[in-house]
Amino acid sequence: MELHAIVAGKDIKGKVEEQILPYGVDKLFVFDGEGLFPYTSAPHTDILVNLFKEEQPQIALMGATVIGRDLGPRVSSLTSGLTADCTELEIGDFDDRKAGKHYDGLLYQIRPAFGGNIVATIVNPEHRPQMATVRPGVMQKALYEGKAKGEVVYPEVAKYVPAEDYVVKVLDRHVEEAKHNLKGAPIVVAGGYGVGSKENFDLLFEL
């Protein structure tokens, strides 16, 4: 099994290769084009959909980020299905007792369900690619110990993205730095209407 990676953006050729290849990537696809940054849904969706039709990957993984949560469901229009916000992934065999079939090397997609009360393990035996988004930080990064020898491919963007995909343009971006990292917080304190007043909310900050 080979590991392929895809990166898309503007003026990234020659800048991203050495950041990605050391993680053991066998083939890196670099899509570099004027309309690929800032992110908009249509161009990036068509890049993945059309590339997947060519490459026929068994598994496709994305980060469960703001972009990943938008892009993943759109790409799963390939009728591949998608498991969102996975906290663990495993490879294993699966027996479908109802259908009487055995499957080798499926992706076990593990995620909390029903408000975190249970952990669900999901498999996609029939459709490809097996798609999942993974929550950032739940898996340890492992650098490839050998020399990075991955192949780098620079596809022609126009072959994958039609001109009408660029009809939506980002005119301005306003990014505010979060005051508190709620994702990494072990305990979150919140207040509601019962606090009574703005002054009483200040007491929560002391906690």
Task: Outline where the language-model segments fall.
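N-terminal glycine-rich FAD/FM-binding segment characteristic of electron-transfer flavoproteins
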Residues: 1-207
